[in-house]
């Protein structure tokens, strides 16, 4: 019993001690005044105020050891800029608050930030998102939310992914709406996306004023819109857009997070008007703390919806409580101006001595909040991820995410390894339902529905009418256009998967540069003609892909390089070959005579006769079989070799001479443009583009001559420089095809001195038609249609002229080459070797038969005597040469040989 009494006394003692410590701790807690400026009465403000109260309650219940307590004073700004400023002034002057949470809008925040800077009172906003607030450069301004401009990169990636080339922003006409525009414009320029116009909606716009803006948007070609409006104005805007017909198939609407973050609290009617739109939404990562908070919120406030602004208000309050606790309780005073001085309340604004220290602690605060990682960097929260949503059904459906390091991706926990330039949108986002309840990706623009047809300028005066030809209809008095360019453009229009209405407008007030400039001035929507693509023109217009081959050709006359005279028969062989051949005739005849002289009567007789026989025998081989018979073995070998050599030589000579007499050896009179420039010769041109290139190359004005038609060009080239014509002309390769198709036997293209991109269709800079037209050109080129048009319009007038593109040199320049000794030296060498061997054999045999004779005269006499030891010594002279013949038959010849032996 005694033990039990002691235990009770001990417990009672500890309880008394604990209560005394708690009382002392409560006495040590310091209250710190904090102001809240909000538009009381709106759904958003009520939600954020509840979140602020829950944040303070949660913080101090989980941190009972803190020495400070935030005491809040709520002031209604009544959705008015002046009232908000007055509220802040009252809080600073009369309540001496050490920080202010709020205000709600960016316009209200501007003046409050200035007051906070002057009084050293931090302004912590959880809903003012305009980027323009950062330009105030106040170190006492903290944005516990995301800057609107932080989402423009996500918007850019969406536009880039689908390849849209024009975007029209829609924004409210105030600080909030205008703040995002500079950064949005910059990022769109990075991907060459134009902003052709902007739709600015007044904050107080009536439904009729909104309808007027929507009707204007409907008449313009751009179909991609980025909407940056506050929630109430956005609801009215999309209601009218649905009513007018701007939410049907073909339109693209991209919402900023100002709207998508509050989709959860919009009613069904408002959501129904936004079906199919895309949006960038603030990403809130899942966490146990967030789920617990949502559960408590639903139980306590079942009729109030929670969104990200409430979470930011909760986190901002927690951050402020942490910062004040760290800053301590020293210097919680204001230094005010002397009350005796006659100054206004603003001029007499006090300065908080607590502000600098609170500024430092706020800048260091970092924790995991309900909305994600909370840390001020340069006074702002920095987003790492945005959510991409597609409004479908009852709300926004997540279709992907955006992160700075990875771009767009489907799942937040499955990031791609890197940004893939050529990936399709299906690889980056989940399926999308577009306006009009379609899954087909809108092309982003279309011909406006205001009945306007494309006005296409076409030149009337054209040098090469195969491209564009204008004729006057005598019945309707209208201009009818035809030609390759016209037919090709119509084929391209048919290849585009949508209808384009257009009218051809004749242009006859200038050249092609003037016509192209009309597109820049807005008089024409396009130009269809044989317009050369050049860098100078591309500075103020856009070109489609070229629909013809590229390049500029140098066309010059050709002439026959061979002079046909009475001595042309000597040209096939070089002088050396002629001399060697003549010498060879004599040598071969001499060798055969030496070998046959002692055994063959046909090579015997008077000296004059024998000399003529030498030449006669060797030369007659070229025409017919010689009458003299060759009897000795070595003579026959020599003759056979000579026969072959003469055959090859005569056949080659005949072929070469025939080529000289029958083939035109055409050579260009000029080989390159540099030779024209060096000699100062005249050059013809047709277009202003080529004129400019010639001037840039150094040609003088006096040497440049314009031609107006293919016939005129032919006349100038035919005259030549000496007779007032030109030595060469420069023309684009497509024109060369036409010109040489008519005059291929007189001229040829020898060089392409200038590189150009060919001929293309002209459009205004940034026209969305350019991409579709270019894609359609590729389709036409890949089909058989392009070849059909070329065959129809570029058929050569002279049917003997081939296509200069597929056969650029129908009359190739043949450089005549005379036959020289180098082509036959092997044959002459063989003949020389055989002759030498035969002579050596003969001399050896002759000296062997006369071993003791050294007297040349005696040897000559022996040489002139018939060889009595030869088996053919009794052969008589051939009747064809002297009336005597060989033995009548073979038996007599054999007997004669036997008798001789």
From Swiss-Prot:
InterPro entries: ANF_lig-bd_rcpt, GABAb_receptor_plant_PBP1, Ionotropic_Glu_rcpt, Iontro_rcpt_C, Iontropic_Glu_rcpt_pln, Peripla_BP_I, Solute-binding_3/MltF_N
Claim: Transmembrane is one of the keywords in the record: yes
Transmembrane spans: 575-595, 605-625, 630-650, 824-844
Family indicated by similarity: Belongs to the glutamate-gated ion channel (TC 1.A.10.1) family.
GO molecular-function term, one example from the UniProt record: ligand-gated monoatomic ion channel activity
Range of residues in the leader sequence: 1-25
Glycosylation sites: 46, 53, 204, 267, 331, 342, 461, 477, 536
UniProt organism field: Arabidopsis thaliana (Mouse-ear cress)
BP GO terms, sorted: calcium ion transport; calcium-mediated signaling; cellular response to amino acid stimulus
Locations listed in the record: Membrane
GO-annotated cellular components: plasma membrane
Known tissue expression: Expressed predominantly in roots. First strongly detected in all cell types of the root except at the apex. Later expressed at the root-shoot junction.
Membrane topology listed for this record: Multi-pass membrane protein
CDD domains: GluR_Plant, PBP1_GABAb_receptor_plant
Record topological domains on the Extracellular side: 26-574, 651-823
This protein's name: Glutamate receptor 2.1
Keyword 4Fe-4S: no
Cytoplasmic side: 596-604, 626-629, 845-901
Known function: Glutamate-gated receptor that probably acts as a non-selective cation channel. May be involved in light-signal transduction and calcium homeostasis via the regulation of calcium influx into cells.
């Amino acid at each position: 019993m005694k033990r039990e009494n002691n235990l009770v006394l001990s417990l009672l003692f500890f309880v008394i001690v604990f209560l005394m410590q708690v009382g002392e701790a409560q006495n040590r807690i310091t209250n710190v005044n904090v102001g809240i400026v909000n538009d009381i009465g709106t759904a958003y403000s009520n939600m954020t105020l509840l979140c602020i109260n829950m944040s303070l309650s949660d913080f101090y219940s989980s941190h009972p050891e803190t020495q400070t307590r935030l005491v809040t004073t709520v002031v209604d700004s009544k959705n008015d800029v002046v009232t908000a400023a007055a509220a802040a002034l009252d809080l600073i002057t009369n309540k001496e608050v050490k920080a202010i949470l709020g205000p709600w809008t960016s316009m209200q925040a501007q003046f409050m930030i200035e007051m906070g800077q002057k009084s050293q009172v931090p302004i912590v906003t959880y809903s003012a998102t305009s980027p323009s607030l950062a330009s105030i450069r106040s170190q006492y301004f903290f944005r516990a939310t995301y800057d609107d401009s932080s989402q423009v990169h996500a918007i850019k990636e969406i536009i880039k992914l689908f390849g849209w080339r024009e975007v029209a922003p829609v924004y409210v006409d105030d600080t909030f709406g205008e703040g995002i525009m500079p950064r949005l414009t910059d990022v769109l320029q990075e991907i060459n996306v134009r902003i052709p116009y902007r739709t600015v909606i007044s904050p107080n716009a009536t439904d009729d004023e909104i309808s007027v803006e929507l009707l204007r948007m409907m008449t313009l070609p751009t179909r991609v819109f980025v909407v940056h409006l506050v929630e109430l104005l956005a609801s009215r805007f999309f209601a009218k857009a649905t009513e007018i017909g701007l939410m049907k198939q073909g339109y693209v609407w991209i919402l900023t997070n100002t709207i998508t973050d509050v989709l959860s609290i919009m009613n069904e009617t408002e959501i129904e008007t936004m079906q199919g739109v895309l949006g960038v939404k603030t990403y809130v990562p899942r966490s146990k703390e967030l789920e617990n908070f949502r559960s408590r919120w639903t139980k306590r406030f079942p009729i109030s919806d929670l969104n990200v602004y409430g979470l930011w208000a909760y986190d901002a309050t927690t951050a402020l409580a942490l910062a004040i606790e760290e800053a301590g309780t020293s210097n919680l005073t204001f230094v005010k101006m002397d009350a005796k001085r006659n100054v206004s309340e603003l001029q007499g604004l006090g300065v908080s001595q607590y502000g600098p220290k609170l500024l430092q602690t706020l800048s260091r605060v970092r924790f995991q909040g309900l909305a994600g990682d909370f840390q001020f960097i340069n006074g702002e929260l920095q987003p790492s991820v945005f959510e991409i949503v597609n409004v479908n059904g009852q709300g926004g459906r997540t279709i992907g995410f955006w992160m700075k390091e990875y771009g767009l991706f489907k799942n937040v926990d499955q990031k791609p390894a890197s940004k893939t330039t050529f990936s399709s949108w299906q690889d980056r986002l989940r399926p999308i339902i577009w306006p009009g309840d379609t899954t087909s990706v809108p092309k982003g623009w279309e011909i406006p529905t205001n009945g306007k047809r494309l006005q296409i300028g076409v030149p009337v005066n054209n040098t090469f009418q195969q491209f564009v030809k204008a004729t006057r209809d005598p019945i309707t008095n209208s201009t009818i256009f035809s030609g390759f360019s016209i037919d090709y453009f119509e084929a391209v229009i048919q290849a585009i998967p949508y209808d384009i209405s257009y009218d051809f407008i004749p242009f006859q007030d200038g050249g092609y540069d003037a016509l192209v400039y009309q597109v820049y001035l807005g008089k024409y929507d396009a130009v269809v003609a044989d317009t050369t693509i050049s860098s100078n023109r591309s500075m103020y217009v856009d070109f489609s892909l070229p629909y013809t081959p590229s390049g500029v050709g140098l066309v010059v006359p050709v002439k026959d390089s061979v002079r046909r005279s009475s001595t042309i028969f000597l040209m096939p062989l070089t002088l050396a070959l002629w001399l060697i051949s003549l010498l060879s005739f004599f040598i071969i005849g001499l060798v055969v005579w030496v070998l046959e002289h002692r055994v063959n009567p046909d090579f015997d007789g008077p000296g004059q006769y024998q000399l003529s026989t030498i030449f006669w025998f060797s030369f007659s081989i070229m025409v017919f079989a010689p009458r003299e018979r060759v009897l000795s073995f070595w003579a026959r070998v020599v003759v056979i070799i000579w026969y072959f050599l003469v055959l090859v030589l005569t056949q080659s000579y005949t072929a070469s001479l025939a080529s000289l007499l029958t083939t035109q050896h055409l050579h260009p009179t000029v080989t390159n443009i540099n030779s024209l420039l060096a000699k100062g010769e005249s050059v013809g041109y047709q277009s202003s583009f080529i004129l400019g290139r010639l001037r840039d190359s150094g040609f003088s004005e006096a040497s440049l001559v314009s031609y107006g038609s293919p016939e005129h060009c032919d006349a100038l080239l035919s005259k030549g420089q000496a007779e007032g014509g030109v030595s060469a002309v420069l023309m684009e390769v497509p024109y060369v095809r036409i010109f040489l198709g008519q005059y291929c036997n007189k001229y040829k293209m020898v060089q392409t001195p200038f590189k150009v991109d060919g001929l293309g269709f002209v459009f205004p800079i940034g026209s969305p038609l350019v991409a579709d037209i270019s894609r359609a050109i590729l389709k036409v080129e890949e089909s058989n249609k392009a070849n059909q048009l070329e065959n129809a319009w570029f058929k050569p007038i002279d049917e003997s002229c081939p296509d200069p593109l597929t056969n650029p040199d129908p009359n190739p320049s043949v450089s005549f080459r005379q036959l020289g000794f180098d082509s036959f030296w092997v044959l002459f060498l063989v003949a020389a070797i055989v002759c030498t061997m035969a002579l050596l054999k003969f001399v050896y045999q002759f000296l062997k038969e006369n071993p003791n004779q050294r007297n040349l005269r005696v040897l000559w006499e022996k040489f002139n005597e018939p060889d009595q030891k030869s088996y053919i010594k009794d052969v008589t002279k051939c009747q064809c040469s002297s009336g005597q013949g060989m033995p009548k038959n073979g038996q007599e010849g054999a007997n004669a040989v036997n008798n001789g032996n």
